[in-house]
Amino acid sequence: VIHQGNGGLSAARNAGLDAARGDLLAFIDSDDTIHPEMMARLYQALSSSNAQMSVCNYALVDEKGAMDRQGVQAIRDEVLEGKANILQKLEDGNWYWVVACTKLYRKELFRTLRFPLGKLHEDEFVIHHVLLGCDKVACISDALYYYFQRSDSITGSAYSLRRLDGAQAQFERAQTLLDNGMPPSSAYH
């Protein structure tokens, strides 16, 4: 257990990264839940395909506990191979690919990466770096992560200038992908 003051989600994730001793990492937001078999299924998909990352689908859960699988842009059971195929998922404009919490990662992907402190949309600042480190990504179509949507959450709150962090993350992602030879259409979505 790590005891530290509230420094936000990035600080908590970074503390976990710094203290991690195993070979695999996962991030679960404190107000969300997971299927009891999520980690075992992600591990099996990752290890059987020798992938650097595995990912599952998610379901939205409202404040009354009702689960909505209809609004989710589902992924299919597949193993993505090659950076171009993996990074293509960012071009699809699917929010699903930029969140950290539906995935199991090999720790080596975060060897030099940390989440930016004081930013909203912190996942979006690092996901392209993570995906650039992957040669294979194993995908599971089942919704094993339950994303709790609160009306007073950061993503559900009224506009503020801090919401521009998402635009900054997208710009940095576009620049990084362009620097790594991705065509402009891939970089700007």
Q: What is each residue range found by the language model?
A:
Residues 122-123, 187-189:
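Short, conserved alpha-helical segments within structured domains
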Residues 1-168:
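Nucleotide-sugar donor-binding/catalytic module of glycosyltransferases
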